[in-house]
Amino acid sequence: YPVDGIHFDDYFYPNLDDSKAETWFDYPEYQASGTSLSVAAWRRNNVNELVRGVYSAVKSIRPQALFGISPEGYLQNLRKDTRQFTDVDAWMTQSGYVDYLMPQIYWGFEAKQNGQAAGYAFANCLNEWVTLKKKGNVKLYVGLALYKTGTDAVDGNEVPEWQRYHDIMK
C-alpha cells in the first residue's frame, strides 16, 4: 500500500569518543577514497549522501511522501567531529535532504549538570533548534519521550521534575 512517509528514528552514527581516526572502523575506506577531506568531513559527507539518496528515492517513488529523521536533540553533540557526523545544519537549511527533522529532546526543563542548568535542558535545546529552523524551510517537530514520564531520574535534581510537577505535560 502507498505509505505516507519514511522516518529514520534514532539515527545515530557509531559514537567515536576516541579522537584517533586511524582506530575507527571505516578508516581503511577513508584512506582508499583518496579524498582531501578530514575523516570527520568525509564521514559527514557520506551520511549526507545517504540521506540525500534516501530522500531522492522516496520522492521518485511517491512524491507526496515525506522523509524525516529523529537525530539526537542536543545540537552541540551533533556538531562535534567525533560524535555522530550528522550535518543537521545542511539538512535543515538546504533542499533535497529531508522534509522534517524531529530532534529527540528528551531532557527536562530543569535538567542540571554539575549543579547548574544544563545546556541540554529542554528549553535550551528547543531554542537552538528553533533558531536553526528559521534558516530553512524544513519542518521541525519535537520528539518527546513519554515513556520517561514519571520514571526518569537523570535530570540532575534530587527529585525529578516529572514527580515534582503534575502539569508538566499540559
What are these regions (language model features)?
Residues 1-97, 104-107:
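Polysaccharide-binding and catalytic clefts of secreted carbohydrate-active enzymes
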Residues 15-18, 77-79, 109-120, 150-156:
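Extracytoplasmic/secreted cell-surface and envelope-processing proteins
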Residues 20, 59, 80, 112, ...:
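Context-gated lysine
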Residues 34, 64-78, 126-166:
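Active-site clefts of carbohydrate-active enzymes
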Residues 36-47, 80, 114-118, 122, ...:
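Residue-level preference for long, well-ordered alpha-helices that form the structural scaffold
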Residues 52, 78-92, 117-133, 164-168:
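Alpha-helical scaffolding within the catalytic cores
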Residues 98-111, 117, 121, 125, ...:
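Loop/turn-rich, solvent-exposed surfaces of beta-rich toroidal or solenoidal domains
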Residues 99, 169-170:
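Extended low-complexity acidic/polar segments
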